[in-house]
Amino acid sequence: MAQQPKPVRRIVCIDDNDSEKSKCISDAPSPDVRLDPARPGYASTRIWVTDRPPGRLKNVRESLNAPHTIEPPPGGSVCRVVTFPPDASYKGRVGAKEVQAFFAAMGSPAASTYSAKAPHPYMQKTRTLDFCLILEGEITLVLDKEEVHLKAGDTVVQRGTNHAWSNRSD
């Protein structure tokens, strides 16, 4: 049985409208988590979403009310924490149907570049600039021409390339 992903603590701070003093309005696990039934242990946890740069600072409502998609809103941004289960827990049991269902559920069906010949079933490509920080453990960035082994503290700048993330641990 796959281990449940660890909740991600989300702290949201603002300046009080009346006193202009800073305070926390939320300190709890992020309420916006999407799982993938085909990959037990996978979790996409959104922390914050903006609908335009640089993001409003005053009179902002909860940002997670926007649809939970892979791509940010047009002109906006998204901060998320993703947990990847070991590939062994799903690889060989996941095909086009499951992968397409995942990308459709995440609001980005066109992002999937699934092919039976692809180096990983969850290959994807979006027109986004992604900053990926490895928080713990190790993971492999799968690209069309190569793979890059990453460890905690490594950072990837993903510039709209075809890629997947592969957790090759037990």
Regions found by a protein language model. Give the residues of each.
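N-terminal leader/capping segments at the start of a protein or of a new domain
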Residues: 1-63
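Short Gly/Pro-enriched turn/cap motifs at secondary-structure boundaries
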Residues: 2-3, 70, 121-123
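Structural motif
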Residues: 21, 138, 162-164
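Conserved short histidine dyad/triad with adjacent acidic residue
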Residues: 29-30, 78-126, 159-162
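Terminal, intrinsically disordered low-complexity segments enriched in charged/polar
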Residues: 46-70, 78-84, 91-94, 101
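Ligand-binding loop in jelly-roll beta-barrel domains
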Residues: 75-77, 85, 147-152, 160-170
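A short beta-strand-loop-beta hairpin characteristic of the jelly-roll/cupin
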Residues: 118-152
